[in-house]
Amino acid sequence: VCLAAQLAASEGNADTTRFSEPTEYLHKACTKALSVLEKDAPKGFFLMVESAIIDGYGHNNDSEGMIEEMKEFDQTLKALIAYVDKHPNTLLVVTADHETGGTGVAYKSHEVNQPEGLHLNFSTKGHTGTVVPVFAYGAGAEKFRGIFQNRELPGIIEGLMRQ
């Protein structure tokens, strides 16, 4: 069973309207998908979750939006890690297909004796060739060590699912 949840519009057209209150859309979507798949796929399942909203913020060079989206992602990731901890035959893989915006971190001020804050800088409104990390947790995570092309991910995952 494969359930793909795309939670935003297509690339470059993502709705980057800020919510007035914190949302848990990604967390809620993942929780619901897991409950449906657990019930309907007793032999196991593959769940791909994408939140393209951060990509839209990157294209817009919107650092505040990116930070808020990362907070939502962090909450979702905590829930997914807890799920893996309760289901030892589960693998969680986190990656990206590209970086957007050429995001860099810099100090807000270079003045001596001033409180320092961080500021995100951007080098483009497009995608970059920056290497994106792959994080894996759970059963089979050791297969994701080292450097490899992202096009190799499906084969690694498929091999693990066949075991």
Positions of PLM-derived features:
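A post-motif C-terminal structural segment
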Residues: 1-163
